Structure formats: C-alpha cells, structure tokens
Amino acid sequence: MMSTPTIKLAPVQKTLVVKSDVERAFTVFTSRMGSWWPRSHSTASSPLVDVIVEPRAGGRWYERGEDGSETEWGKVLRWEPPAKVVLAWQLDGRWKYNPACVTEVEINFTALGAQQTRVDLEHRHLERLGDNASAVRELLNSGWGGILDLYAKQLA
C-alpha cells in the first residue's frame, strides 16, 4: 500500500522593526503577551483575559479566561532571552488544542540600536495541520501580520 506524500508548506515569515531596546522587546513579547494579544483570537469558551508564556524551556503557553479557566496553546521549546524564543503551537487546523499536532513559532530579536529591534517571526511545519493546512496557512499569514502590528503598537 502506497502512502500519500506530505506536501511541505512554506512557513509564514514576518519581520518588523520596533521602537524598543532588545530586552524590552523580548519581555513584552513573552511576559506581557496578554497586554497586546487580540481578545478575538481565543480558543476558550470564556472571554480571554490573559495570554501566558511560562519563562523557561518546557514551560506552558496558554490563555486564561474571564472565569479563571486555562486553555492550552502549546509549550516553550527554547528560551534564550533576549535573543530568541521558540514556541510549540499545538492548535490543530480547527483551532483546538491537540498535543499531537505540533507546529513551531520561532521569534528572533536583534538589536539594531539602543531603541530599535528587528523582530523575525517564522511559523513552520504547517503541513502538520492536516487536510486544511493550506487554508489555515493563509489565515495564519494574515493573522500574524495583525497580531504583530498590535505588539509593535504596545512598544511605541
């Protein structure tokens, strides 16, 4: 029996320059994600009040709802402040937490000056999202653009 080969999808890649030193850019992205993450981008039944990235490799990445509930999004794969964080995105192609479905979001922070930092985001292994991976990739491509705009405004 022949297996169907998996078609590799191009990663979503975004780059922006923010008005911040590299340490603050990293901290606001990781430790204050809930302050800029759009409230509409939630997977829980209760309205989103915070997004938490536990500051260590192996830490959790999750949202907290108004009712105190926690909904998993993934895990921290690499924690290298203030230069890099790699997150395991464990939301499947239907935006539900699935520990068996792992795509990766890598964010690199590069100081360009005292108050300027380049932020490079790559969301890869999108073919792992299943049958509707191509459609989800397009949603992520536009979604990450808007999300990073909100992040940049938080730093301005």
Across the structure, where does each feature detected by a protein language model lie?
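Hydrophobic pocket/interface hotspot
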Residues: 25-29, 61, 76, 87, ...
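Hydrophobic ligand-binding cavity/cleft-lining segments
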Residues: 1-48
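Hydrophobic-ligand binding "helix-grip"
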Residues: 37, 43, 51-52, 66-116, ...
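Generic structural detector for well-ordered beta-strands
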Residues: 15-19, 54, 62, 75, ...
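Short, highly charged C-terminal tails/helix-capping segments
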Residues: 45, 50, 153-156
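A conserved amphipathic terminal alpha-helix motif
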Residues: 125-156
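Solvent-exposed alpha-helix faces
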Residues: 30-34, 81, 149
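Short, compositionally biased strand/turn segments
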Residues: 1, 50-60
